[in-house]
């Protein structure tokens, strides 16, 4: 069914196809790899390096390896562990739980009871209500509806593959949530299974169970009903 990919690059799931890198402080990291998931093991060290280079006139250091822009709003009940960077004009709302290795961009919303772990969140992203985002990258202006989550470990604990209609990429990774391209909309209470990659400008129906690759400019109704936007 699938073409096993070894040295051949699958263009549609590359960083260049999914993201506008001018909309993230992680641009140098993402430019150093081909596929977005290849950046996941490097997020922690990148944040520490970047954080130590930030202008202290703009970013306040709150605890070990935690840098928060002075224009950002962090509610008292939020928990933030380092390493972490919170960008300009971002809101971290009540009871948000940031477990570390989180690079959150400008003008973002990390909402009520949302949990982040080992993530790159581009500018203008909203994860506003009861979301779990782990070992994932969310592109510019993407939005996850209430209760939608990225599942980052398979139930049988085997290594994650990224699969499309005609390709199968072995990532060699046990923990891999989802890669959302720019302007992706995920409907409420959807589950993005390990290894999900959603192309830019695509919409996911509420209550969806998504796995594998969803092409850009698509509407995902269910696994067997993915239509192109017109």
What are these regions (language model features)?
Residues 1-65, 201, 207, 216-218, ...:
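Terminal amphipathic alpha-helical/low-complexity segments used for targeting or macromolecular assembly
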Residues 67, 85, 103, 179, ...:
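ABC ATPase A-loop
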Residues 74-113:
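Glycine-rich active-site/cofactor-binding loop and its immediate structural neighborhood
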Residues 26-27, 121-123, 128-230:
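Glycine-rich hexapeptide-repeat left-handed beta-helix
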Residues 79-80, 97-98, 115-117, 132-134, ...:
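Glycine-rich beta-solenoid repeat tracts in large extracellular/virion proteins
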Residues 62-83, 211-212:
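N-terminal capping/interface segment
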């Amino acid at each position: 069914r699938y073409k096993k990919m070894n040295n051949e690059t699958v263009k549609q799931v590359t960083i260049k196809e999914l993201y506008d890198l001018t909309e993230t402080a992680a641009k140098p990291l993402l430019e150093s790899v081909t596929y977005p998931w290849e950046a996941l093991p490097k997020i922690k060290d990148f944040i520490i390096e970047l954080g130590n280079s930030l202008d202290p006139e703009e970013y306040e250091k709150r605890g070990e390896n935690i840098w928060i822009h002075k224009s950002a709003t962090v509610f008292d009940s939020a928990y933030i562990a380092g390493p972490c960077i919170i960008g300009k004009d971002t809101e971290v709302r009540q009871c948000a739980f940031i477990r570390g290795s989180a690079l959150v961009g400008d003008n973002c919303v990390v909402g009520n009871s949302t949990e982040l772990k080992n993530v790159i969140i581009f500018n203008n992203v909203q994860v506003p209500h009861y979301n779990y985002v782990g070992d994932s990258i969310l592109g510019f202006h993407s939005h996850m509806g209430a209760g939608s989550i990225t599942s980052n470990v398979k139930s049988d604990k085997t290594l994650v593959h990224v699969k499309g209609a005609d390709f199968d990429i072995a990532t060699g990774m046990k923990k891999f949530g989802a890669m959302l391209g720019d302007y992706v909309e995920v409907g409420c209470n959807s589950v993005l299974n390990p290894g999900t990659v959603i192309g830019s400008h695509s919409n996911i129906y509420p209550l969806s169970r998504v796995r594998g690759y969803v092409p850009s400019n698509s509407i995902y109704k269910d696994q067997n009903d993915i239509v192109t936007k017109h």
